[in-house]
Amino acid sequence: MNVKCERFIVKGHVQGVGFRYHTSHQGLKLGLTGYAKNLNNGDVEVMACGPKEKIDQFCEWLQEGPRTATVESVTRESVSYKPFRGFKIL
């Protein structure tokens, strides 16, 4: 299995609406590891590690997010693989 890590920056109305909780839940549902973290500028940083196909599915989900959020844009970049335990909310 070819595993990788990708870092996402999600912009929009994504803080104070349960975005990190739902992101963590979706990541675990897909078997990914990583984290979701609020940034000072109002964006959310998401790190996801796992099989490329699952990360692609996760990216599609991030484009919409939960119903409580309004996602304006998602940027995506590959980063060095790091082993994470679970999918944390930071």
UniProtKB/Swiss-Prot annotation:
NCBIfam families in the cross-refs: PRK14426.1
Coiled-coil annotated residue ranges, if any: none
Species of origin: Vibrio parahaemolyticus serotype O3:K6 (strain RIMD 2210633)
PANTHER family xrefs: ACYLPHOSPHATASE
Catalytic reactions on record: an acyl phosphate + H2O = a carboxylate + phosphate + H(+)
Record domain Acylphosphatase-like: where: 5-90
Pfam families per record: Acylphosphatase
Enzyme class, spelled out: hydrolase
EC number: 3.6.1.7
Protein name: Acylphosphatase
Annotated catalytic residues: 20, 38
Phylogenetic lineage: Bacteria, Pseudomonadati, Pseudomonadota, Gammaproteobacteria, Vibrionales
Family under the similarity heading: Belongs to the acylphosphatase family.
Record's keyword annotation contains Hydrolase: yes
Record GO terms (molecular function): acylphosphatase activity
Keywords, sorted A to Z: Hydrolase
